[in-house]
């Protein structure tokens, strides 16, 4: 087995979207090649309702699919197909914009005013960009959780992991999307298909992906349960870690444990032309999109 080395890592960047929602952009609107088939990912997390309550009013999408994963709080949504509903703690929404859809997403937070979730954009291949739009809300009870003997918890949101199939299905990118918690100072390996590109995004605790390929030989600065460990190059909260080639990912959890998303997909390898929420093959197609969506 070949452990995937870290190609690069960086912190998510603060930005503002929608009608004034403060969030952190994990990646997006730049070079998409390291993330293909994924286009963008946002971490929307805030304890102050004034920084998210205005939400994301009516806006269009075309040529993409989105996966929204709510950790805490509530997001109310509606679209031009007549669908409406809400997402709460642990719920997911998968939306295929396809040929075009107009929708809104309005975060409401929880009883303490806290809101936390993620939205991931996946590209649609050229032969599916004009497919009929559709969406599905998935409740938290539908998500399988695996608990290892060492206390590691793996939630399978999409893909097939150790025989457990995630409820998010039918996405062109065929993503594997895992929410993983590893207890303090535990070392874990996770299989990773060699044909896929992928990344980890840390949102709680910290850990080491850089030196995890040699966990035993790392000298120890601190004693824990009779053993010594040195945790170098720790990556912490809001850190994106992008992997190079290999067939597994290894991580050494830090002293507080680590929780992260591990996401991969099969590259589409097609041109990407952005016009805000519209993603097509060329700029000429994006300019033709808005009039046709709003005329529906």
Predicted regions: what they are:
Residues 81-94, 207-250:
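Short acidic-glycine-tyrosine-enriched beta hairpin
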Residues 90, 98, 183-187, 195:
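Tight coil/turn sites that cap or link beta-strands
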Residues 286-292:
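Conserved small/polar residues in nucleotide/adenosyl-binding loops
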């Amino acid at each position: 087995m070949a452990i995937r080395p870290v190609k690069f890592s960086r912190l998510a960047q603060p930005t503002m979207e929608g009608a004034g929602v403060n969030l952190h952009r994990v990646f997006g609107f730049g070079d998409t090649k390291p993330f293909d088939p994924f286009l963008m990912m946002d971490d929307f997390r805030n304890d102050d309702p004034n920084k998210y309550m205005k939400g994301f009013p009516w806006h269009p999408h075309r040529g993409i699919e989105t996966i929204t994963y709510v950790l805490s709080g509530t997001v109310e949504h509606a679209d031009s197909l007549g669908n409406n509903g809400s997402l709460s703690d642990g719920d997911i929404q998968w939306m295929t914009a396809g040929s075009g859809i107009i929708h809104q997403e309005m975060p409401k937070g929880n009883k303490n005013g806290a809101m936390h979730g993620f939205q991931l954009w996946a590209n649609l291949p050229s032969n599916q960009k004009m497919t009929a739009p559709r969406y599905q809300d998935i409740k938290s009870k539908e998500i399988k959780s695996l608990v290892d003997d060492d206390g590691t918890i793996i939630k399978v949101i999409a893909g097939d992991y150790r025989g457990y199939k995630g409820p998010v299905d039918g996405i062109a990118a065929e993503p594997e999307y895992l929410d993983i918690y590893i207890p303090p100072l535990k070392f874990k390996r996770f299989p990773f298909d060699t044909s896929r590109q992928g990344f980890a995004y840390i949102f709680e605790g910290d850990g080491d992906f850089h030196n995890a390929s040699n966990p035993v030989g790392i000298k120890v600065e601190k004693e824990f349960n009779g053993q010594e460990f040195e945790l170098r190059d720790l990556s912490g909260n809001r850190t994106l870690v992008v992997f190079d080639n290999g067939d597994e990912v290894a991580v050494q959890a830090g002293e507080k444990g680590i929780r992260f998303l591990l996401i991969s997909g099969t590259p589409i390898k097609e041109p990407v032309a952005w016009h805000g929420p519209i993603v097509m093959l060329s700029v000429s197609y994006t300019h033709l999109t808005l009039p046709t969506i709003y005329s529906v």
